[in-house]
Amino acid sequence: MTHLFEGVGVALTTPFTNNKVNIEALKTHVNFLLENNAQAIIVNGTTAESPTLTTDEKERILKTVIDLVDKRVPVIAGTGTNDTEKSIQASIQAKALGADAIMLITPYYNKTNQRGLVKHFEAIADAVKLPVVLYNVPSRTNMTIEPETVEILSQHPYIVALKDATNDFEYLEEVKKRIDTNSFALYSGNDDNVVEYYQRGGQGVISVIANVIPKEFQALYDAQQSGLDIQDQFKPIGTLLSALSVDINPIPIKALTSYLGFGNYELRLPLVSLEDTDTKVLRETYDTFKAGENE
């Protein structure tokens, strides 16, 4: 069985202009990603500010991306919530719109136990019958999908991957022992750890920085797959990632997507833009990175 994708999937931002979703900017951004070797596009996830999007906006964004991508790469819809029934309904609608897969975060606030996680994810997968990427991000949910739970869920025919945002390599190794990596993919959810994640057998990354450097980030994966040492190749990307860590995602990345013309530098409350000085430093760091490519 082949994986859903290998390499770089982009956790897509949502462009706003005057607090409205800018569909034309969205199309421009997606075309840029497709032209620069993105291997998958993840819509309506954390980076998209999904908690601030209405159901209608989420569906319009997803349909726009699906129509534009036209099956060239997988489109994965973020449909997970902390309510199983609502997650099912959102996932069914995503399937009806043409999504290739869904991504499901662990329930938050009314968090459950591991047995509840199994029932939650299996109920959605059973109802929707579309490939599922589990999303483990304990820094945002205060809950983790334990390796034993991943093992159980990986046996489900529609649960095919894990987005692992733990930044914990012991966790990765424990999961690897318990799954068949030929049929179940492990994607990093942390751009800054991809060198070691790839070395330890990860199949790719669901990336924030790839919103602005998709080609360069995919080239890193391709080089590693070719057996090359990618530490030096990663260093300039690492410098840009350090600059992006000035604030909480997606606040910094939208300072760069807007710089490239993909909507205004706008976020919806409770998120706020960087201070002007931080925005200037981040954009200068991006310019330095791009200039270094051309030397």
From Swiss-Prot:
Give a Pfam family name: DHDPS
- Where are the bilayer-spanning segments? none
Q: Which reaction does it catalyse?
A: L-aspartate 4-semialdehyde + pyruvate = (2S,4S)-4-hydroxy-2,3,4,5-tetrahydrodipicolinate + H2O + H(+)
PROSITE patterns per the record? DHDPS_2
Where mainly located?
cytoplasm
User: Anything known on activity regulation?
Assistant: Is not feedback inhibited by lysine.
Tell me its EC number(s), please.
4.3.3.7
Provide the protein's localization.
Cytoplasm
Enumerate the active-site residues: Y135 (proton donor/acceptor), K163 (schiff-base intermediate with substrate)
Q: Which residues form a coiled coil?
A: none
GO molecular function terms noted in the UniProt entry: 4-hydroxy-tetrahydrodipicolinate synthase activity
* Signal peptide start-end: none
SUPFAM superfamilies per the record? Aldolase
Does the entry feature the keyword Cytoplasm, yes or no? yes
Disulfide bridge positions per record: none
Pathway(s) it belongs to? Amino-acid biosynthesis; L-lysine biosynthesis via DAP pathway; (S)-tetrahydrodipicolinate from L-aspartate: step 3/4
Report residues binding pyruvate. T47, I206
Q: Which UniProt key words apply to this protein?
A: Amino-acid biosynthesis, Cytoplasm, Diaminopimelate biosynthesis, Lyase, Lysine biosynthesis, Schiff base
**Residues at site: Part of a proton relay during catalysis?**
T46, Y109
Biological process GO annotation list? diaminopimelate biosynthetic process; lysine biosynthetic process via diaminopimelate
Q: Which InterPro entries match?
A: Aldolase_TIM, DapA, DapA-like, Schiff_base-form_aldolases_AS
- GO annotations of cellular component type: cytosol
Q: How does it assemble?
A: Homodimer.
Q: What does this protein do?
A: Catalyzes the condensation of (S)-aspartate-beta-semialdehyde [(S)-ASA] and pyruvate to 4-hydroxy-tetrahydrodipicolinate (HTPA).
Task: Name the family the entry cites.
Answer: Belongs to the DapA family.
Protein name stated in the entry: 4-hydroxy-tetrahydrodipicolinate synthase
Q: What's the source species for this entry?
A: Staphylococcus aureus (strain COL)
This protein's encoding gene: dapA
